[in-house]
Amino acid sequence: MKNIKNSPKLQLKSTGTPFQGTVDYKNIALLRKYISTEGKILPRRITGLTAKQQRAVAKAIKNARMVGLLPFINLEGY
């Protein structure tokens, strides 16, 4: 059986120090760090955020999508 933790698919994404303060849906540069190339929100185990921070980031990403600042999906590769 493979060791899941050493799998190359689950390598942690280094985002440096997690953000300080509040998350805003207008801060697109920050939110793009927590979105995959396909446009999906990255999970906590990859981003290294706390549960509270992850909920705030997810909510901000969803708000930015509804306003039109972020795409729902990335169609560049298709």
From Swiss-Prot:
Biological-process GO terms, alphabetical: translation
Disulfide-bonded cysteines: none
GO molecular function, one term: structural constituent of ribosome
Gene Ontology CC entries for this record: chloroplast; mitochondrial small ribosomal subunit
Keywords assigned by UniProt, alphabetized: Chloroplast, Plastid, Ribonucleoprotein, Ribosomal protein, RNA-binding, rRNA-binding
Entry superkingdom: Eukaryota
Location in the cell: Plastid, Chloroplast
Family membership: Belongs to the bacterial ribosomal protein bS18 family.
Subunit structure: Part of the 30S ribosomal subunit.
Protein name: Small ribosomal subunit protein bS18c
Organism: Oltmannsiellopsis viridis
Upper taxonomic lineage: Eukaryota, Viridiplantae, Chlorophyta, Ulvophyceae, Oltmannsiellopsidales
